[in-house]
């Protein structure tokens, strides 16, 4: 996968509606799930108890936190596109987040991004993107969200 190169933040205005691409598949491990649980102090058994899930979970394996998948968006986005002449990018928010399918431990995920909007805002460009986190060999995605990023040149 090669990254889409954007020359400047204002150039996003010219590619509204364009599909920017998808990442390579990324394995989601129990180690990563446990690290996220530790960082957020969310130790719900469905995420961390590898024995209890065998008997008490419909998935029979642990699942990643929905917010873990969401938190991967900035890293995965950087694999899809790079903006030259960019001094700073700020996370401005996320809208319309839907956690559709659980990410079962040892599944592979990838992100796909489409530019929904780009407009002048607060001296920068407010970029709205549709991000889909897919699960390999799963009909439905893990999540779909509209991310807002403020880009400064």
Where are these regions (language model features)?
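HotDog/MaoC-like acyl-thioester-processing domains
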Residues: 1-15, 103-153
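Hot-dog-fold acyl-thioester-processing enzymes
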Residues: 2-90
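Compositionally biased, intrinsically disordered low-complexity segments
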Residues: 49, 92, 128-130
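Short alpha-helix capping/helix-loop boundary micro-motifs
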Residues: 94-99
């Amino acid at each position: 996968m090669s990254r889409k190169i954007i020359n400047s933040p204002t150039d996003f205005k010219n590619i509204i509606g364009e599909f920017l691409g998808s990442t390579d598949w990324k394995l989601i491990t129990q180690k990563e799930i446990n690290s996220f649980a530790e960082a957020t102090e969310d130790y719900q058994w469905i995420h961390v108890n590898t024995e209890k899930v065998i008997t008490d979970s419909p998935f029979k394996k642990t699942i990643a936190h929905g917010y873990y998948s969401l938190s991967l968006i900035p890293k995965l986005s950087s694999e899809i596109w790079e903006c030259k002449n960019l001094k700073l990018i700020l996370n401005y928010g996320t809208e319309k987040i839907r956690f559709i399918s659980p990410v079962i431990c040892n599944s592979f995920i990838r992100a796909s991004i489409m530019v929904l909007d780009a407009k002048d805002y607060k001296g920068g460009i407010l970029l709205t993107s549709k991000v889909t986190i897919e699960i390999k060999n799963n009909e439905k995605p893990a999540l779909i969200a509209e991310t807002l990023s403020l880009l400064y040149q």
